[in-house]
């Protein structure tokens, strides 16, 4: 029977009480390695360190679930926002569990506690007159018949020198500048791709200018006392320098905390206002006595971890909200901010699926302690850092395997050797350790490393803390080598006993110091020492255990029997690195599509095994039997490879000025300029669905005039049996514009222009159709791109023309 969970921890008078939070990961996707090191993992390391020191600490985190991004993702996946949240909350929980993240509470913001706490804070702000009503202009989509929240709009960033083409309505991903949707150049609705219009709507605003004196006093005092990281101070000062402006706290959405105000009952709170309150509400779901953590600033220290794009929300917005209530809140003392972790040649991107994601890391079979170590040695504390597979390989093989793992394995393996060659797994006695010169020199170095470790960790300089611990391992290896213990065993047994007992103590010390960074590694080392995690060294000030580091030979008693040594790390080979680099190239969507395309191509190949993969195989055989050599050559020439079918992007579509049934499209097919194409699709596909979408385009038909406008290609579409329903043949969303559509088993270059006399198109099109799985096919062979196969929406066994 499982033991009941421990009771919630509460602040204890007279002890150091620390509340650790990580920026709440947004729930609309799988976290990538940049997200993980930026907040969740960094906070976990610090919380574990606090436990190591004996501080009374809780670590609070959870998924941020309200807002536009959730609604958008729900639309993409054709489900409700709650279903999206349930799905991705479980995904996040599983990823963090695999990474050995130890939360005291991992909650979510779509909870009753969130509504209760958020609305209570709002009421206090209303009572204290820090909120004002105002009319603002917001983008409204006539096609979707809704106001567009920030993340439902994309356009060109207006910031000089940036001009990023896919800036979101709330923030530019490229330059990190916070935006209003109306500031975007050429904005588009993310749902239908149409251009929205500006329309008035009433909202509530937090009067940041009126709170500025209180806020500036808080920032000036706390940034010094709390040793804020320099990047946090710079980002905050940049905001203050621009001048604080009233900030809207409501949005025209359905998915969120309802505003408890009659006039605004159909609106919800804006996610920037709502999300940081999630730290409080998740604590409230951890313990009903949450106020003992959040309303006792004299007795609780709040440490917050996040990426640099989250800084203003935590140093300006959230503190202003709490200050405005007039209540005595536990305000942030220390903020630890990371820059960006970039991936190989570009940026990690959750929205674009680029990089290695949490589930990807698990699939590599590289253990979580290796991922934790690599991310933490590469933690972007003062500037952007770069993830590369070669660097991961170097750090694993050199630092973990050859340094740390080698030291521990050499020590324990020698102790485990049978008597006459070692100590038969029994730790020897070493009464004269203090007078052994080489050991005294090692202890002096170790003490300095421990002091540096503690100093760095207290200042939340995690990378330096890890470096200090690893320095002990390097010195331990040098100590072993210089001692020549393998000779001492025969020549000076007493000295050898000192070296080995001291080394076993250093192994134990390393297991304890590295626990915050690599907990599963530490547990394994303790297991090989035949010790439990409960026997781990505590660096509590009141227990005097820091001083014990000066006598490492005393850590493990003489006569203690160790466990069975085994290698702690496995070499990462060049061919594995190359395999991972190829496997994780491109975006997640492209990788998924490629895997699907490979699987479908294999399926087709298996089906056609034993047959000749050329057009008209049976006809060809029949012609051969009848001796018609001329006809045979003609058949060989009529192959689907003659068709130049490409992935096209409709840049613009409009009604033909002189024909009610025709559209005129401008389609990008990867050439210098878009092609003009005329299509008879008006009766079947609404105009708004023809905008900014990818299609399959036959590009080598002879241009033909249609009601006065020359068409230079043909959009491929499937129709049902009675031609009452027509659907476009759609390539995968991540397929490259201009990429040629291919057919497994049919190779060759397309004709520049199809020969009308030979009726090539007429012959080949007779075998173009959608199959029972809605895949577009030539005979039984799918239309294939590098990103996957092309499909139709719902028409099975339809003709494609």
Swiss-Prot record:
Pfam families: Anticodon_3, tRNA-synt_1g, tRNA_bind. ATP binds at residue 350. This is Probable methionine--tRNA ligase. One of its GO terms (molecular function) is methionine-tRNA ligase activity. Residues 639-742 form the tRNA-binding domain. It is an enzyme of class 6 (ligase). NCBIfam families: metG (TIGR00398), PRK00133.1 (NF001100). One of its GO terms (biological process) is methionyl-tRNA aminoacylation. It is found in: Cytoplasm. PANTHER family: METHIONINE--TRNA LIGASE (PTHR45765), METHIONINE--TRNA LIGASE, CYTOPLASMIC (PTHR45765:SF1). Belongs to the class-I aminoacyl-tRNA synthetase family. Coiled coil: none annotated. It catalyses: tRNA(Met) + L-methionine + ATP = L-methionyl-tRNA(Met) + AMP + diphosphate. HAMAP family: Met_tRNA_synth_type1. A motif ('HIGH' region) lies at residues 25-35. InterPro entries: aa-tRNA-synth_I_CS (IPR001412), Anticodon_Met (IPR041872), Met-tRNA_ligase_1 (IPR023458), Met-tRNA_synth (IPR014758), Methionyl/Leucyl_tRNA_Synth (IPR015413), MetRS_core (IPR033911), MetRS_Zn (IPR029038), NA-bd_OB-fold (IPR012340). Residues 606-633 are annotated as: Disordered. Its EC number is 6.1.1.10. A motif ('KMSKS' region) lies at residues 347-351. It comes from Oryza sativa subsp. japonica. Keywords: Aminoacyl-tRNA synthetase, ATP-binding, Cytoplasm, Ligase, Nucleotide-binding, Protein biosynthesis, RNA-binding, tRNA-binding. One of its GO terms (cellular component) is cytosol.
């Amino acid at each position: 029977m499982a033991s009941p969970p421990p009771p919630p921890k509460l602040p204890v008078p007279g002890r150091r009480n620390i509340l650790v939070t990580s920026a709440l990961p947004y729930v609309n996707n799988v976290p990538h390695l940049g997200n993980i090191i930026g907040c969740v993992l960094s906070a976990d390391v610090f919380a574990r360190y606090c436990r190591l020191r004996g501080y009374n600490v809780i670590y609070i985190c959870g998924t941020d679930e309200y807002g536009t991004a959730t609604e958008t993702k729900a639309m993409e996946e054709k489900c409700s926002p709650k279903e999206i949240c349930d799905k991705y909350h479980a995904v996040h929980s599983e990823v963090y569990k695999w990474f050995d993240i130890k939360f005291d509470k991992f909650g979510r913001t779509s909870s009753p506690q969130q509504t209760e706490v958020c609305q209570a804070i709002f009421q206090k702000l209303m009572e204290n007159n820090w909120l004002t009503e105002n009319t603002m202009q917001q983008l409204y989509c006539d096609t979707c018949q809704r106001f567009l929240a920030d993340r439902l709009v994309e356009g060109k960033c207006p910031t000089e020198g940036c001009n990023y083409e896919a800036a979101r309505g709330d923030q530019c991903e490229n330059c990190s500048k916070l935006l209003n949707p109306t500031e975007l150049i050429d904005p588009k609705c993310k749902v239908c791709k149409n251009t929205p219009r500006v329309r008035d709507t009433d909202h509530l605003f937090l009067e940041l200018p009126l709170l500025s004196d209180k806020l500036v006093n808080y920032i000036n005092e706390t940034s010094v006392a709390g040793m804020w990281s320099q990047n946090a101070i710079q980002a905050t000062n940049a905001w203050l320098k621009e001048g604080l402006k009233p900030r809207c706290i409501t949005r025209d959405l359905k998915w969120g905390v309802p505003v408890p105000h009659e006039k605004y009952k159909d609106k919800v709170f804006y996610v920037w206002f709502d999300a940081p309150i999630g730290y409080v509400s998740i604590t409230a779901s951890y313990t009903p006595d949450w106020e003992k953590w959040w309303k006792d600033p004299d007795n609780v220290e709040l440490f917050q971890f996040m990426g640099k794009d989250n800084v203003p929300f935590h140093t300006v917005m959230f503190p202003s909200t709490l200050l405005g209530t007039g209540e005595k809140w536990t305000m942030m003392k220390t903020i630890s901010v990371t820059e960006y972790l970039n991936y190989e040649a570009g940026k990690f991107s959750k929205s674009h699926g680029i990089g290695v994601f949490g589930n990807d890391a698990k699939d590599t079979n590289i253990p979580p302690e290796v991922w934790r170590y690599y991310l933490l040695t590469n933690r972007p504390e003062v500037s952007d850092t770069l993830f590369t597979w070669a660097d991961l390989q170097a750090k694993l093989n050199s630092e973990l395997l050859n340094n740390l793992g080698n030291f521990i394995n050499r020590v324990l393996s020698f102790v485990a050797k049978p008597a006459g060659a070692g100590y038969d797994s029994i730790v020897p006695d070493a009464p004269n350790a203090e007078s052994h010169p080489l050991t005294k020199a090692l202890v002096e170095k170790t003490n300095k490393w421990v002091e540096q470790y503690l100093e760095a960790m207290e200042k939340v300089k995690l990378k330096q803390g890890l470096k200090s611990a690893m320095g002990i391992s390097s010195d331990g290896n040098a100590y072993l080598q210089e001692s020549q213990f393998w000779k001492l065993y025969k020549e000076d047994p007493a000295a050898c006993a000192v070296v080995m007992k001291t080394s076993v103590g250093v192994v134990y010390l390393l297991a304890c110091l590295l626990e915050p960074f690599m907990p599963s590694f530490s547990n394994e080392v303790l297991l090989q020492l035949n010790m439990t995690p409960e026997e781990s060294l505590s660096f509590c000030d009141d227990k005097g255990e820091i001083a014990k580091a000066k006598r490492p030979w005393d850590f493990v008693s003489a006569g203690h029997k160790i466990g069975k040594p085994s290698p702690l790390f496995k070499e990462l080979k060049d061919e594995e690195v190359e395999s991972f680099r190829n496997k994780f190239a491109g975006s997640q969507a492209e990788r998924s599509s490629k895997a699907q395309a490979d699987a479908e191509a294999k399926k087709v190949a298996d089906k056609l095994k034993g047959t000749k993969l050329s057009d008209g195989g049976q006809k060809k055989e029949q012609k051969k039997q009848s001796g018609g050599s001329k006809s045979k050559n003609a058949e060989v020439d009529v192959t689907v490879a003659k068709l130049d079918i490409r992935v096209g992007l409709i840049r613009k579509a409009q009604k033909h000025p002189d024909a009610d049934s025709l559209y005129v499209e401008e389609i990008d097919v990867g050439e210098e300029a878009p092609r003009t194409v005329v299509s008879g699709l008006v009766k079947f596909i609404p105009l708004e669905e023809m905008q900014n979408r990818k299609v399959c385009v036959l590009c080598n038909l002879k241009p033909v005039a249609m009601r006065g406008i020359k068409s230079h290609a043909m959009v491929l579409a499937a129709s049902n049996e009675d031609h009452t329903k027509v659907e476009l043949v759609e390539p995968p969303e991540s397929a490259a514009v201009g990429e040629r559509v291919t057919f497994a088993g049919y190779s060759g270059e397309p004709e520049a222009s199809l020969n009308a006399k030979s009726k090539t198109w007429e012959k080949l099109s007779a075998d173009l159709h959608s199959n029972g799985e809605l895949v577009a096919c030539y005979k039984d062979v799918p239309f294939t791109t590098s990103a996957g196969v092309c499909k139709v929406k719902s028409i099975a066994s339809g003709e494609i023309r």
